[in-house]
């Protein structure tokens, strides 16, 4: 169900500044490895825009992955320490699999990765001894090419059979503590984004020779 403008206009909101990509001729490159201090991790240049960010909690039941590309659900976890890697994989992975299956109706769910982000002022993301930092740029994680490739990377001989059916890559996010005042998560209603607005980027996981 797509939310009407009248419904959206009636929601609580805040104004915020988000970093979009400055238009550029070449494809941006993101570097996912340790770099010397001061070296940017992306060739893309951020362009700040002030936008309206709505609180969709009052209409959470009207949102869906199939329409808006997002779902807001309540979930109680048995995890006691989200900074404990073993507990995350032992307890939270099965919880997340059950949650995604319930929300999507999927017959099979595989959790293949997780990231715990915690703001450290002055910390550099992906640097030794620093937890992963909040992402400060508007972005999408997968393209029509990299999504199926992720399935091939993970599923081996099963991949082509699985790709002959419908599949989704779903991000599950939650606050470890709240309320969040520093870097709360914002997501975009997919019905408001044109496919032509997406800019594919290249991700480099190792230093070139």
Model regions and ranges:
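Non-heme Fe(II) oxygenase catalytic core, chiefly the N-lobe of the double-stranded beta-helix
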Residues: 3-209
């Amino acid at each position: 169900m797509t939310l009407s403008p009248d419904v959206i206009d009636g929601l609580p909101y805040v104004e915020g500044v988000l970093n979009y990509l400055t238009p550029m001729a070449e494809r941006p490159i993101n570097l996912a490895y340790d770099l010397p201090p001061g070296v940017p991790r992306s060739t893309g240049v951020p362009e700040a825009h002030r936008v309206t960010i709505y609180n969709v909690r009052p209409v959470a039941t009207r949102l869906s992955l199939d329409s808006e590309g997002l779902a807001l659900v309540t979930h109680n976890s048995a995890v006691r320490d989200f900074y404990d890697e073993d507990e995350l994989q032992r307890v939270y992975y099965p919880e997340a699999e059950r949650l995604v299956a319930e929300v999507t109706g999927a017959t099979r769910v595989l959790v293949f990765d997780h990231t715990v982000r915690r703001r450290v002022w002055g910390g550099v993301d992906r640097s030794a001894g620093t937890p992963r930092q909040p992402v400060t740029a508007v972005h999408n994680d997968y393209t029509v090419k990299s999504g199926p490739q992720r399935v091939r990377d993970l599923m081996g001989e099963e991949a082509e059979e699985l790709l002959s059916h419908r599949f989704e890559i779903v991000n599950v996010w939650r606050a470890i503590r709240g309320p969040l005042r520093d870097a709360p998560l914002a997501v975009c209603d997919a019905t408001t984004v044109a496919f032509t607005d997406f800019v594919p980027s290249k991700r480099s996981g190792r230093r070139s020779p």
